[in-house]
């Protein structure tokens, strides 16, 4: 492909990708699948890699994040980002309307045109577009000076890097709120707790923490979103009203909340507020009130500002979702991954119409940091569907009888050893037979990527547990047809199929068996390395930390986790029972003289032609090694869409980068 053809294709791809970004993030009506989007994105990445001088700061490929910064630069807002005055009652809303009319010299019976907007609970930012190109993004800061977070805001998919208009304004400053959807917030916190990191207290903190990351690659991995709601300085365009401004920027590709609505007078403001109060808990994001603005920009200018807030707007806040109560007890509970979490049993109290009697304390480090004790008077907060949490302790109410709960020495469910992993906040039960972990461990053990017990899914595993037929994974190999026939709507043929699937799993590869055990930090890739290095589960069980660390890609954290797992007598007994039942993991054979013998591959980004596990199997089948990180010893990096730090490192080290098509071509060359 010559350079001109490439340039034309790059321009077409950028236009198409930005169009699909707008349809997906701003208009919520995608036209293509994620896989189709990734295919277009990968093509653009490939062309920009082959023709580096075609790269541009407004390309969709710039959203993946770059090298970390040392610090944030300061940005002075051309027009200050003022805070809003608050209102909490119907009377205060009516007072606001009266003040507006008095200042404008209007009669009391005149109804003002207002705009009502959900008040997003996120991080306020300003986007600066110069001739349609996003050049600067900053936080609100103190309203006058904020921080330059352009590199992070460029990773937010909903923010267009170029406005979708033929004649963009010379300058357009847009204010908006970056937020983290509730579902994404819950996934992020679950992941952080699984990795031993402290959870975020609420979605607002998560959004703010993500945008204020010095490493934009971390920001890029978090599904942040934005709604834009106000202009800053504008040159080369004019708007008569807030409604016109929102319509226009929406046409230009900037996300605008579809719940924003023009209203007339106090009665319609109150109706909108009550509607948002009722809808609050069903929204996919956090809001903490309603913002009311005079629609006309001419009237806004006439009304002007006070020292800290505009006269033409007010924030109507929802009732607080906090309450004061007493911690009657602190109970350790075991999660599905073995993490032991302290949970506060509270004196029942009503918060936002819901009676709350329990609250998460997250982990012992967090509990100790807040100094939460049994008997304490505390402030709790409830946010949407998120489990209530203790915000702070009212230490002035202590009597001296309050007592802390120490980390338990053994698991409260099974009595197994409790381990506090160094450099983690999580406290974990290491017992494979722990009742609180059994369900998830059995589902994982039987899954397709582990022992592949075809047909034995969650529904049947739950029935096995309910009937008391299994207590850990070893019990699967003792099941009989008569026991399966106790299930609801179970026939002879289906029972036989399930038994056959369990029987067939006895001969799975050693790497699958190691992965199926659910050892912390040991995924499929590490399981293959361990199987290749030790050849049997007995050898792995006897391995020392030094022997484990000698394996490429096995670090201290993984080594400690493996040793801790096999030190547990319950885990060793479970394995012995499986072997006694006939489980015989088989050693894997590598192809000698294959196409990739002696070659190391790393796969990164979103692959569209095959999954990452499938690609790794292709490499290993041909005698190669599929690694998880890039080093000087890496021969090839296969890059899919949104490839990040691994692709950057490959380029720095001069490692050859392949597209998926180029990888498949190598595989077929023979």
Curated annotation (Swiss-Prot):
The keyword Transmembrane helix does not apply. Residues 591-670 form the BRCT domain. GO terms for biological process: DNA repair; DNA replication. Keywords: DNA damage, DNA repair, DNA replication, Ligase, Magnesium, Manganese, Metal-binding, NAD, Zinc. The keyword Nucleotide-binding does not apply. Zn(2+) binds at residues 411, 414, 429, 434. InterPro entries: BRCT_dom (IPR001357), BRCT_dom_sf (IPR036420), DisA/LigA_HHH (IPR041663), DNA_ligase (IPR001679), DNA_ligase_AS (IPR018239), DNA_ligase_CS (IPR033136), DNAligase_adenylation (IPR013839), DNAligase_N (IPR013840). NAD(+) binds at residues 34-38, 83-84, 117, 140, 177, 293, 317. SMART domains: BRCT, HhH1, LIGANc. GO terms for molecular function: DNA binding; DNA ligase (NAD+) activity; metal ion binding. Its EC number is 6.5.1.2. It catalyses: NAD(+) + (deoxyribonucleotide)n-3'-hydroxyl + 5'-phospho-(deoxyribonucleotide)m = (deoxyribonucleotide)n+m + AMP + beta-nicotinamide D-nucleotide. GO terms for cellular component: cytosol. It is an enzyme of class 6 (ligase). Pfam families: BRCT, DNA_ligase_aden, DNA_ligase_OB, DNA_ligase_ZBD, HHH_2, HHH_5, Nlig-Ia. Transmembrane segments: none annotated. NCBIfam families: dnlj, PRK07956.1. DNA ligase that catalyzes the formation of phosphodiester linkages between 5'-phosphoryl and 3'-hydroxyl groups in double-stranded DNA using NAD as a coenzyme and as the energy source for the reaction. It is essential for DNA replication and repair of damaged DNA. PANTHER family: CHROMOSOME TRANSMISSION FIDELITY FACTOR 18, DNA LIGASE. Belongs to the NAD-dependent DNA ligase family. LigA subfamily. HAMAP family: DNA_ligase_A (MF_01588). This is DNA ligase. It comes from Geobacter sulfurreducens (strain ATCC 51573 / DSM 12127 / PCA). The gene is ligA.
